[in-house]
């Protein structure tokens, strides 16, 4: 069906979001049009504020509105351990279990030879620099997803860090192969941390 241009543009904008197909985008567009002006203005204001005010922590790469982020500046955290994750959503998932008290490093992606993504295309150099410049870090826990790309990334990091004498561990296999950390329940994540294995 042909919609007026403003609706068609709104539908097109919604389809750019991950997991949103044309039907859902159409439903969201019509719902948005039915919202009050105040709600639409607040939605737009919050969307712009999130885009403009958030940045990546210069230490760990996590999304933050302060740089460095509140995790990196929290003196009560265990500074001997760094948990390496794919993206900021994984940091949130791990923080929910309230059992990990170390630091994080966000890669912003995974090594994916099939997609032409190599080690230089993710936030890996800053991890290596961070480890080189900080002798307090003794263990790196790799918490990438249990996918082919997650495994490739974990193995690469392990190979690079082993000569430096840093203990490199991997989350235990409470996580199903192909599963995403952000969707795992808290008990599964807790068991995966507790039973991590050395690489």
UniProtKB/Swiss-Prot annotation:
InterPro entries hit by this protein: DNA_Rcmb_RecR, Rcmb_RecR, Rcmb_RecR_Znf, TOPRIM_dom, TOPRIM_RecR
Entry GO MF terms: DNA binding; zinc ion binding
Keyword Lyase in annotation: no
Keywords tagged on the record: DNA damage, DNA recombination, DNA repair, Metal-binding, Zinc, Zinc-finger
GO biological process, one term: DNA repair
Ranges annotated as C4-type zinc finger: 57-72
Domain of life: Bacteria
Keyword Nucleus: no
Residue stretches making up the Toprim domain: 80-176
Record-stated family: Belongs to the RecR family.
Role according to the record: May play a role in DNA repair. It seems to be involved in an RecBC-independent recombinational process of DNA repair. It may act with RecF and RecO.
PANTHER family reported in the protein's UniProt record: RECOMBINATION PROTEIN RECR
Protein name per UniProt: Recombination protein RecR
């Amino acid at each position: 069906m042909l919609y007026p241009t403003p609706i068609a543009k709104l539908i097109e904008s919604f389809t750019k979001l991950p997991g949103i197909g044309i039907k859902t985008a159409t439903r969201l567009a019509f719902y948005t049009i039915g919202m009050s002006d105040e709600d639409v203005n607040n939605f737009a204001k919050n969307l712009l504020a999130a885009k403009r005010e958030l940045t990546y922590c210069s230490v760990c790469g996590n999304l933050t509105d302060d740089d460095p982020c509140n995790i990196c500046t929290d003196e009560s955290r265990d500074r001997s351990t760094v948990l390496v994750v794919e993206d900021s959503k994984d940091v949130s998932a791990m923080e929910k279990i309230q059992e990990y008290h170390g630091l994080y490093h966000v890669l912003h992606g995974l090594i994916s030879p099939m997609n032409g993504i190599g080690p230089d295309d993710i936030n890996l150099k800053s991890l290596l620099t961070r480890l080189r410049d900080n002798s307090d870090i003794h263990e790196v826990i790799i918490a990438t997803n249990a996918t082919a790309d997650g495994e490739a990334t974990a193995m690469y990091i392990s190979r690079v860090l082993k000569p430096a004498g840093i203990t490199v561990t991997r989350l235990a296999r409470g996580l199903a192969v192909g599963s995403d950390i952000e969707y795992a329940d808290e008990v599964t994540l807790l068991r995966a941390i507790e039973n991590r294995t050395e690489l």
